[in-house]
Regions:
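Nucleotidyltransferase catalytic core that binds NTPs
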Residues: 1-240, 249, 253, 274, ...
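Structural motif
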Residues: 49, 263-265
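A structural signal for short secondary-structure junctions
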Residues: 239, 260-263
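Short, basic/aromatic-enriched C-terminal tail that caps enzymatic domains
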Residues: 255-257, 265-286
Length: 286
């Protein structure tokens, strides 16, 4: 069932809640791939009813980013969702989500602003305001759908940590379910932005996973010094790569690590041409 308005979603949610059914939410920006489908599968298995939102959220894009070019494939997304057992595909317009405010100026919108300590690093360092937009839209989706469970991929691990913090601090009655990164056989993490990559770019993009897997292998052999682990990365980089960051952070609060341990996440971001890609790996069983 494809719906475009908040009122339609709320009507169905009222019916489901009255019947005592559990509701799962999978927030997406569309251009669905097997990574999204793994989240959807978990939601359908765990919940009585599943809602997938398809919304390219304008307020989480920074100036000069790919808002206008971001792939929009609603018909294909709807078919994938229906085949996966999704009950509602919620595909609102920006006006439906934000009224006239977003057209006039972001100064007219009420935002959910996550703690600066969580957003002034990694992706938030170069994408100023990005996580304000993410937290605002996810909070709105939680208010609209009122899910019991919400499913997010671990590929956007910083986002996942920030959203968990938001849910805890604002006492939002939803349980966030983290979902494992889905990779191509080559090791490349699935992403909607992979559609921008040429075949040559895809080969160069393998540097992300190769660096992370190599760091994990070195850690498993007993190397814990972050500087030493970082130095192992450079042999995988060439002139096609513009490394934005390679950082070791705590899995709970994103504090920077000097010595790696089982609660460490290794984060990487790099550009290949104009395409920015991110990935991460946990060094322990988290």
């Amino acid at each position: 069932m494809l719906v475009h308005t908040i009122a339609e979603v709320r009507e169905k949610i009222r019916e489901w809640k009255k019947a005592g059914l559990t509701v799962g939410l999978v927030p997406t920006m569309g251009a669905l791939h097997n990574g999204h489908l793994s989240l959807i599968k978990k939601a359908v298995e765990k919940c009585d009813k599943t809602v997938v939102s398809v919304f390219v959220n304008p307020i989480q894009f920074c100036p000069g980013e790919d808002l206008d070019k971001y792939p929009r494939t609603l018909d294909a997304d709807k078919e994938l969702c229906e085949n996966a057992g999704v009950d509602i595909v919620f595909a609102p317009s920006p006006k439906e989500m934000y009224g006239e405010g977003h057209i006039m100026s972001n100064d007219f919108l009420t935002y959910v602003i996550p703690p600066f300590f969580y957003v002034n690093k990694l992706c938030g360092k170069s994408r100023v305001g990005h996580f304000d937009g993410v937290c605002t839209v996810v909070n709105k989706l939680f208010n609209i759908v009122q899910p019991d469970f919400a499913f997010f991929g671990e590929k956007d691990r910083q986002q996942l940590i920030i959203l968990k913090k938001m849910v805890k601090d604002l006492n939002i009655p939803v349980q966030i379910i983290p979902c494992t990164i889905v990779r191509e056989e080559s090791g490349l993490a699935l992403s909607s932005r992979n559609k921008y990559l040429s075949e040559e770019d895809k080969v160069n993009a393998l540097a992300l996973s190769k660096i992370l897997f190599n760091i994990k292998a070195c850690y498993d052999k007993g190397i814990t010094d972050v500087k030493a682990l970082t130095e192992t990365a450079y042999s995988f980089l060439n002139e096609a790569h513009a490394l934005e960051y390679l950082e070791f952070r705590d899995a709970d609060d994103l504090e920077e690590k000097q010595v790696a341990d089982g609660n460490t996440i290794v984060f990487i971001a790099l550009k290949i041409g104009n395409v920015r890609l991110i990935d991460n790996i946990a060094l322990g069983n988290i």
